Design a protein with these regions (language model features):
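Short histidine-centered beta-strand/loop micro-motifs
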Residues: 40, 48-53, 70, 78-79, ...
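Short cysteine-rich clusters marking metal-coordination/redox-active sites
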Residues: 123-128, 162-165
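A short, N-terminal "cap"/entry segment at the start of jelly-roll beta-barrel domains
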Residues: 1-42, 47-49, 150-178
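A short beta-loop-beta micro-motif enriched in histidine and acidic residues
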Residues: 33, 44-58, 74-75, 101
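A short beta-strand-loop-beta hairpin characteristic of the jelly-roll/cupin
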Residues: 52-83
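Conserved metal-binding segment of the jelly-roll/cupin
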Residues: 41, 79-101, 109-110
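Short, flexible, mixed-charge glycine/proline-rich loop motifs
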Residues: 111-121, 149-157
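Short, non-ligating residues that shape and space the ligands of small metal-coordination modules
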Residues: 134-137, 171-172
Length: 178
């Protein structure tokens, strides 16, 4: 990566808010970095999936609030962050970042392209926390690679139906094919 001049992150956010739109609302700000994905992520989002990453992720909340739901030994737990709060999320622990309206956060994680590392997306029943579906894949572009998997899950009633209690997770209209 070439040496880049420092820049004012708050100014960058103000100039690029129009790019930070749902459903995921993220923008990689150092695309040419060889080692890290450095993203600004905006809310609101309504993701019901959990992300699996084989490396740690750093969350720093700049504006508003985020709740990072985690799956810890079969139990759903909530990590709440307000502006100024930071959280280092452990590797190999499914997590679901849920951002409030108007929130902005910085997320830093290691690049996985060119490694044997796999990313994963998992969905859990909202009633009993039973795992509904999971998929693991090599990540090459964090702004694009999740979309296909979201569409596959939300367009299948079978995948969204809990085999333990029968609850059906609502389909997300942003990812369903009409």
């Amino acid at each position: 990566m070439a040496i880049l001049k420092p820049f004012n992150l708050n100014q960058w956010i103000d100039e690029n808010r129009h790019l930070l739109k749902p459903p995921v609302g993220n923008k990689n700000i150092y695309v040419d970095s060889e080692d890290y994905i450095v993203m600004i992520v905006a809310g609101p989002n309504a993701r019901k999936d959990y992300h699996y990453n084989e490396t740690e992720e750093l969350f720093y909340q700049l504006e508003g609030e985020i709740t990072v739901y985690v799956q810890d030994n079969g139990e759903k737990k909530a990590m709440k962050l307000s502006a100024g709060d930071m959280y280092l999320h452990p590797a190999k622990t499914p997590h679901s970042p849920n951002r409030s309206e108007g929130s902005i956060g910085l997320v830093i994680e290691q690049k996985r392209a060119g490694t044997n590392a796999k990313d994963g997306l998992l969905w859990f029943c909202e009633n009993c926390n039973n795992k509904l579906y999971d998929v693991y894949f090599p990540l090459t572009d964090i702004e694009k690679d999740f979309l296909h998997h979201f569409e596959h899950f939300y367009n299948s009633k079978d995948l969204r139906t809990c085999t333990k209690c029968g609850t059906v997770m609502e389909s997300d209209p942003r990812f369903t094919v009409k």
